[in-house]
Design a protein with these regions (language model features):
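Short, charged, surface-exposed hinge/linker loops at domain edges
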Residues: 1-26, 54-94
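Short aromatic-glycine-(Arg/Gly/Cys) micro-motifs in beta-strand/loop hairpins
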Residues: 26-43
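Intrinsically disordered, low-complexity regions
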Residues: 33, 46, 75-77
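Short acidic, gly/pro-rich beta-turn/loop elements at beta-sheet edges
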Residues: 35, 48, 58
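A short, exposed loop/beta-hairpin motif centered on an aromatic-Gly-Thr core
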Residues: 44-55
Length: 94
């Protein structure tokens, strides 16, 4: 299948995975229990809740990768509010 011109210019998924998205963690009460809510507000729908901050961060990382993959596979726009920490196009992952 031929690649469209805009797809040829699109960075690979690793490029987007290296973007340092804002991270927000807060304590929230749900049904009499305190949970930690973690989110990347710049990525639509990238939010999780867990009993501890560590668990929330671990779950958020999995969710971030799912959201990026879903946007990537769907050809949607992926927010890039700041440059990646590393540019996978010039420094391939080992």
């Amino acid at each position: 299948m031929a690649m469209r011109a805009e797809e040829a210019d699109r960075p690979d998924l690793a490029y987007y995975e290296a973007v340092p998205y804002l991270l927000v963690i807060e304590s929230v009460e749900r049904h009499g229990q305190w949970l930690r809510r973690a989110e990347h507000p710049e990525l639509p729908g990238c939010v999780v809740e867990a009993p501890s901050a560590v668990e929330a961060l671990e779950e958020l990382e999995r969710e971030r990768r799912r959201v990026l993959r879903r946007l990537w596979d769907g050809g949607g726009l992926i927010p890039v509010p700041r440059p990646p920490l590393r540019d996978s196009r010039s420094h391939p992952a080992t």
